[in-house]
Amino acid sequence: MVYLLCPALLLLMSGCESEVFLSGQPEEGNSSDGKVRVEIFARANTYPLPLTKGLEDENTVGMAPWVLVFKGNDANATFIEAAQAFELAGKRYVILTRQPAGSNYRLLILANPQQFFYYGDAVTAYSFTSENFRLNMTPEVTTLSDICSRLLTEPLNAPSCTVIPYSGAGELIPMSYLLTVDKIDNTTKIENTDKSSLQLVRAVAKMVITNKAPNFEFPRL
């Protein structure tokens, strides 16, 4: 059995971050300067096949994903804010600005982010900081579609034919999920409507090829 892991270009989406400090987190059920604490329920989407040989861990979801908030129903939804989640008592939380009912909001969850992102090209690398997000995106102007087409993951440092992406020690696969909610307040939870955890989508595609012939070779994709 031969396992191939093909890197796919992940269109990450991001925006201005409200930096969160543990000392300033509002208690559950309360607000601080219009902010609310929202719990995140998420896990990696399950493969129906065995784990890929060579990967340290292809199912782990880190405890500090980014959550990007957009107002609207579709790709033209406009960016509101972005914040990085934090771990508290073994759970994931994120501090978001309260948003009233009456409109739809799209939450883009970006888990296991890399050290850098690229915006518009693969030349200039930006670390994940609020300042760098503000250099590239404008609240209430930049759309979900804009970010989909411009914000990218780090390019591979070596040809994928010789190095399996995200196979290094402690190197987690970037994952994402797009969720729609009708408000953001202290009752909001980032989960499915049936209360189950979101099944995040990995930034790479996995192909499993089975051939029992002793002389089988798979030349390329």
Segments the model singles out, each with a brief description of its role:
Residues 3-14:
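Bacterial N-terminal signal peptides
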Residues 16-221:
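Sec-type signal peptide cleavage vicinity
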